[in-house]
Amino acid sequence: MDAAAAAHEPLLAAAPPTSGKATAADGYGRGRHEEGRRLASAEAKRLLRLAGPIVASCILQCVVNMVSVMFVGHLGELPLAGASLATSLANVTGYSLLTGMATAMDTLCGQAYGARQYHLLGVYKQRAMVVLAAACVPIALVWAFAGRVLLLLGQDAAIAAEAGAYARWMLPSLAAYVPLQCHIRFLQTQTVVLPVTASSAATALLHPLVCWLLVFRAGMGSKGAALANAISYGVNLAILALYVRASNTCKGTWSGFSGEAFRELRQFAVLAMPSAMMICLEWWSFEILVLLSGLLPNPQLETSVLSICTRVSNEIGAGQPQAAKRATRVVMYMALSEGLVISFTMFLLRNVWGYMYSSEQEVVTYIARMLPILGISFFIDGLHSSLSGVLTGCGKQKIGAAVNLGAFYLVGIPMAVLLAFFLHLNGMGLWLGIVCGSIIKLLVLIIVSCCIDWEKEAIMAKDRVFSSSLPIFWAATPL
């Protein structure tokens, strides 16, 4: 070492290596470490550019239902309980199923776009709309007779009647919800995320006005809040449909409606059903909490509070980014940081959050007691949602569905029933049980993600895309 170098050598520097081999090995190790940090930093920036608008748009989309429940909550405890129960039934029997089936587009469109088979994205979007529209027929029948269904499930008669009326006024929302979900995924899988965020923001800003006009100005009460959802979904859909038709960004992926949408429907359904089950099995477990809360003492209070906790959890936790090998590690760090910040914020705001949903002091106080548990739930949910996104990106929805089935239905819900009904923890016990299921899911998904063979997955994705590829001259013809 020369004098100049020695002058800058720290006093407590490590002893120099004793051989040239060691020096080369250390240099190689440091080089790999620096390269890994550089790649991780680049991946984090890329994910934030993509995921930031996606997360924002998902939260803004949840604002529609959230604001509707807020308006109903200020009509009284019974309307809030009825609207909450109807929304939970709609989520269990409709929205969760449709959202889950639409996530098949995340796999198909995402991999087709990566393989530069751009014309397939438009075909997949139309195919998804056909399959989801068919699924709406039985869903509409359940919603039309929601009051009777809830009575059969043992719910309070007054709450069931209120919920039945609310559910019937939610029926028009199906007509807009299906194409809206397909348009959103069609754009997001092309990394076209800012228009989705902008349309969701415009809808979120408009929705409170629509709710006020229908609920109070027109005197429709809770029914007006349900109808407002359909109007806002329709506005969001109209904005995105105009963008797809007019934008140069979608020229290569959308060329109009095509008869190809009616081909290979079975193949789409084969992927859509595991996708739906993966989403539904987790989503249903949270909505079952609301249904179970109707069987507790003071069902109006328990149902109101549990539904608010479910809405808050869904709206904040929506939209975790999807990634692969290196991105998985990066997104877990991001989810960890996000979870800590939002959980802490929820804890600080626990005494004021309830006033957004209800003027009843009893409801507000109960929510304040529940929010610390909800913060823990959200923190865990952020981590396992990121890993679930990895499975969706790989097309492994069957594994995700099996994990959700075991975690929530063999552990979470039985534990919730035990804590709520046998240990008499009521609504708090229901939520603690689901937290137990979430912890099991997180642990299992960590193990599954560590076992993924990424090279094999890349080959399978390529095979899946090109086995479905259409000749360019088969692509849709503009109307």
Predicted regions: what they are:
Residues 77-84, 88, 163, 167, ...:
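Small-residue hotspots at the loop-to-helix junctions and early N-terminal turns
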Residues 19-31, 45-106, 273-293:
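Signature of the first transmembrane helix
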Residues 1-51, 108-176, 194, 203-273, ...:
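Short alpha-helical transmembrane segments in multi-pass integral membrane proteins
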Residues 56, 60, 64, 93, ...:
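Residue-level hotspots within pore-lining transmembrane alpha-helices
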Residues 82-98, 231-235, 303-311, 439:
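Alpha-helical transmembrane segments of polytopic membrane transporters and translocases
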Residues 100-113, 290, 309-320, 388:
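Helix-loop junctions and terminal segments of transmembrane helices
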Residues 107, 176-200, 378-405, 421:
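Membrane-interface junctions at transmembrane-helix termini in multi-pass inner-membrane proteins
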Residues 55, 59-81, 150-157, 213-220, ...:
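Helix-terminus/linker motif at the lipid-water interface of multi-pass membrane proteins
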